[in-house]
Amino acid sequence: MKKIEILAPAGSFDSVIAAVRSGADAVYLGEKAFSARSSAKNFDDEELKKATAYCHIHGVKVYVTINTIVFDDELEKLKKAIISAAEADVDALIVQNMGVARLAHRLAPDLALHASTQMSIHTASGVKALYEMGFKRVVLAREMSKKEIEKCCEIPVELEVFVHGALCMCVSGQCYLSAMIGARSGNRGSCAQPCRLPFSVNNQKGGHALSLKDNSIVNYLGELQNMGVASAKIEGRMKRPEYVSAAVRACVEQRDFGFISDKTQKMLRGVFSRTGFTDAYYIGKTGSHMFGTRTKSDVVSADEKLFSAIRSSYKDEIGNVEITFDFTAKLGENPVLVVSDGVHTVKKIADTVTEKAINRPIDAEKCRKQLEKTGSTAYNPTDVNINIDDDISIPLSIINSLRRDVLDELDTARSVVHNYKINRDYEITFPKFTPPVEKSTRARVTQTKLSNAF
């Protein structure tokens, strides 16, 4: 059975590093425009290329969010954003607006499309409709139960389920509270989270009647995997890198070992909590116990000592990509080093000729030790084959240079996965038909002030 993907949020490049080094299989991130989390740092064109290359080198996928509602006068800007994502060689776009999906397909037909949770897909019929439209993956609404998810798994399309992170009081994509109160629309990436403010119910002041605890169904990853869910998604592009690391580690432990260690559970609760977590939607037992706020004890638990400990856990490269080295050195010939990751093969020949040793000849073990010095890279040499003549001399600097050169070229080869065909000349056109509007109605609309709408 294929392992469920661990999908991590990344609001910054630091979060990308934290996710990858903590064991994520994929990350999702936003461009500067058209992201449903505009408050996150997000990524410009060059940062997106850098992040995607880093992830691909480590065997991690990248999904870019263009999941807001788009206005007609933004379509040229949208076109540039889609082309930028395709040029960066990302693995998929996460979209809400069907117009965005259509334009993306016109510009880069082979670029996979994922249906955002902002589409509010919560039934098998909705999943089926998107599958028939050509979407590769559907991100289900957070509010679904186990039975509802199981029903959706009957459709032959990848499903993505939120397993940890914030819950909205309203279904994603359907909330207009922030837009109505402060003209900051969640469907434009600017939700002010007014549901976290104090609200009274039946004149009982002092409560937070709309604030839900964070969702956490990490403990059910085995069930989700057995159902056929493709991806376990962590919410939190506006959270710190330490949060990303802790959440990813919890998911990886649960998936790979069937439990989460006490240490990781403590980290997960400590980095962010609203008086604990809830699994109420998933198990089908909703109620008042789902509500919670960020208390003083929650804030105190998230101290700098905890964050420092988490940072230290991902400060170094993890060497998660297995490679093999083949080194050959014959007397009177140029040494040759070949590296392979099982898909890509890179060969480098030294500029100097191997000479007969005068004092101490090099041996196979010395060559092996030099080639295994890959600590600052993504690579882990699992097999090092040495084929050298006796009584020869090779400066260690030559071996080091060959190692660096082949790994640099391997980085370049691994960073490009898709190399999409992009239709840059595609022109965006608008229908010329304008629905008839009565003059009296047009006048009324023109004279109405925006403030009167609230």
What does each model-identified segment do?
Residues M1-S22, A26-R37, K49-T52, H58-A86, ...:
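Surface-exposed amphipathic alpha-helical tracts and adjacent flexible/coil segments at the periphery
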Residues S38-N42:
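Conserved non-cysteine loop/helix-boundary elements of the Radical SAM core domain that shape
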Residues F43-L48:
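Glycine-rich, highly charged phosphate/nucleotide-binding loops
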Residues G99-V100:
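Alpha-helix capping/helix-boundary segments
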Residues A104:
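RNase H-like DDE/DDD metal-dependent nuclease/strand-transfer catalytic core used by mobile genetic elements
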Residues H122-G126:
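Short, glycine/polar-rich helix-capping loops at beta-to-alpha or helix-loop-helix junctions
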